[in-house]
Amino acid sequence: MCGIWYSSGFSDISNKQLEIVSHRGPDYSNMIKMSNSIAIGHNRLSIIDLNPRSNQPMFSKDKNHIIVFNGEIYNYLELKDELEKLGHVFYSTGDTEVLLHSYLQWGKNCLHKFNGMFVFLIFEKSTNKIFVARDRFGIK
């Protein structure tokens, strides 16, 4: 199980937040500071696509959207195929990138397409907006 977090409004953001949830993901940890008071962090437990290209936080191709994700999208291969037919290009083989592309394609309506257990946060740098969602049953 991975660990994700988002911090806003605190001027003292440090790697301490990553350390607190390090037991949730021993394979990789990273924090992205957007400003002195906004940060996104992720502790990874590698399950799908063990390659470092799937480390998080993960950026969209244009670097405007950043995602942190915990869980599993069971139908991600079907969604990936649908998105590729719509012109999306993927650089990893995991479900995190599929989730991000789904949001970029369908916005909040992407939630109706996911079959799985998940919690994720997407930060849009150009607007400083966040989108946070979890699975229907609150497993994650």
Describe these PLM feature segments.
Residues 1-140:
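N-terminus-centric sequence/structural signature that marks the extreme N-terminus
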